Amino acid sequence: MSVFGAMDVSATGMTAQQTRMDTISQNIANVNTTRDGNGNVYRRKTVLFEEKSYPTFSETLGMANGHIGKGVKVSQIVEDPSEGNMVYDPSHPDANEDGYVTYPNVNTVTEMTNMIDATRAFEANVTVLNSTKGMAMRALNIGQS
C-alpha cells in the first residue's frame, strides 16, 4: 500500500466516524421528540459500515496477493425497530386515550457511550494519518541529505 493509500484509508475511517457522530447527535437531540413530520414517534438511528469494495477485476485479484483494503464506508443508516418508552402524562398533547405518551427508543447513556467510542475511533484514524504523514516527511528528508 502506498503512503497515499494509507492516508485514504484513514480518511475513510474519519468520514465514517463523522457520519456516526452526526447520527448519534441527531438521536440525542430527538430524545424527547414525540412525533416527527409524519406524526410518528422518532426512532433511534444506527450507522452500518462496510469495507470499501474493489471496483475492478484486477484490483480484486490484488487481494489474493496480499493487497490491503481501501477503507470503510457507510453502507446505510437504519432505524432501530424497538418500541419507544411509554410515560404516563395525560396532559401531553400526544398522549393516547389512556394518558400515555410514547417517547423515542433513545437511551441517552447508550448514545453518550457510543459518542465516546466514535470520538476515540476518529482520534485513532487521525493518529494513523499523522503517523503516515510523518513517515512520508521523513522519507522526503532522507532524499535531501
Cite the ranges covered by each PLM segment.
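Amphipathic alpha-helical polymerization modules
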Residues: 1-145
